[in-house]
Amino acid sequence: MRGYKIFSGSANVEFARQVSKYLSLPLSDAGVKRFSDGEISVQIDESVRGKDVFIIQSTCAPTNDNLMELLILTDALRRSSANSITAIIPYFGYARQDRKANPRVPITAKLVANLIQAAGIDRVATIDLHAGQIQGFFDIPVDNLYGSIVFNDYIKAKHFKNAIIGSPDIGGVARARSVAKHLGLDIVIVDKRREKANESEVMNIIGDVKDKEVILVDDIIDTAGTIVKAAEALKEKGAKSVMACCTHAVLSGKAYERIASGVLDELVVTDTIPLKEQLPNIKVLSVTPVFAEVIRRVYHNESVNSLFI
C-alpha cells in the first residue's frame, strides 16, 4: 500500500495538528527556516518516495510568505518523488482579486492558481472561496467546501425563537439564501455602498427585522467595518440581536476594536486562520474534522460529495 503523509506549513500549525489527531497519523517532519535576508529554506526530513502527500497551509497574513512557503514545500516534495501532492488551503489568500474591477489591474487569484499548479500540486481543497469561479482558474481538481457545514448545526443549537438570515451586502445574497433554505428561515439583505477599499457605508435594509434575531453570514470578516455597520443598521430597524457567522477571521486593522464594541452580540468564525486575540463575543468552530475527512476520502478514492451542503 502506497501510504500517505501530512505536512504542515507554519501558517496554522495547530490546525494541522488537529487534522493529524483526527486521522491518528502524526505530522511528518519538514524543517522550514528563514535565512537572514528573509528567504525561505525547506528540508524534508523523511522519505516521501511513492507516497500521497497532503500539505496543510493557509495563505493568510503574512500572505506572501505563507504562499511562498507552500510553493517551496511543494517543490521539495515533488523533487523527493512524492506520488501525488494535495494542498489543503483552509484560507485561500488573494481570492478577493478574482476579476478586473478597474482598468489596468491584475487578476491575482488566477496568477496564484497558475503558481500553485506550476509548483506541482495535483489537487486543492479549501473552504468558502470568496468567489466560486476561482475553481475555474485551475486545471486540476479543486474541492471548495462550505462553512455552513459547521454553522448550520451551531445556529440550530441556539434554538432561536424568531430568527432570520441576513446578508451584509448584495454580493452575499446567494450564500445567505443557501443557509436560509437549509434552516427554513427567511432572509434580509443589507444594501451598502463601498466608497473605497476597506470602508463601507450601510444604505438600506431590505426586509423586516423588527424583534428578530438576525444571523449575518459571510465568507470573510476583515476590518469588520461592513459587518458592524450592518449590525448597527439592523438594530436601528428594531432587530432584537445580531450574530455574524463568517468563515475566515482575517480581522485586520480596527477589527478587534469594532467587535469588542458590543454592536455584534456574537461573532462566530472557523479556525482556518489563527486568532490574534480572544474576545468574549468571538466563538471559534473547528473545520479540522471536515478537512481530515477530505484527506481520508481523497486518499482512499472515495467521494467527497456528502461533505458539500
From Swiss-Prot:
The compartments listed are:
Cytoplasm
UniProt key word ATP-binding: yes
Q: Where does ATP bind?
A: 37-39, 96-97
Q: Where does Mg(2+) 1 bind?
A: 130
Q: Which residues form the active site?
A: 192
Q: What class of enzyme is it?
A: transferase
Annotated GO molecular function terms are: ATP binding; kinase activity; magnesium ion binding; ribose phosphate diphosphokinase activity
Q: Which co-factor is required? A: Mg(2+)
Q: Spell out the Pfam families in the cross-references.
A: Pribosyl_synth, Pribosyltran_N
Q: Report residues binding Mg(2+) 2.
A: 169
Question: May I have one GO cellular component term?
Answer: cytoplasm
**Which SMART domains would you find in this protein's record?**
Pribosyltran_N
- Its Enzyme Commission number(s) read 2.7.6.1
- GO terms classed as biological process: 5-phosphoribose 1-diphosphate biosynthetic process; purine nucleotide biosynthetic process; ribonucleoside monophosphate biosynthetic process
Q: Kindly state what the record says about how the cofactor is bound.
A: Binds 2 Mg(2+) ions per subunit.
| The reaction(s) this protein catalyses | D-ribose 5-phosphate + ATP = 5-phospho-alpha-D-ribose 1-diphosphate + AMP + H(+)
The UniProt entry's sequence similarity note says: Belongs to the ribose-phosphate pyrophosphokinase family. Class I subfamily.
What the entry lists under HAMAP family is as follows: RibP_PPkinase_B
Its assembly, as annotated, is: Homohexamer.
Its job: Involved in the biosynthesis of the central metabolite phospho-alpha-D-ribosyl-1-pyrophosphate (PRPP) via the transfer of pyrophosphoryl group from ATP to 1-hydroxyl of ribose-5-phosphate (Rib-5-P).
What protein name is recorded for this chain? Ribose-phosphate pyrophosphokinase
Q: Which organism is it from?
A: Campylobacter jejuni subsp. jejuni serotype O:2 (strain ATCC 700819 / NCTC 11168)
**Taxonomic path:** Bacteria, Pseudomonadati, Campylobacterota, Epsilonproteobacteria, Campylobacterales
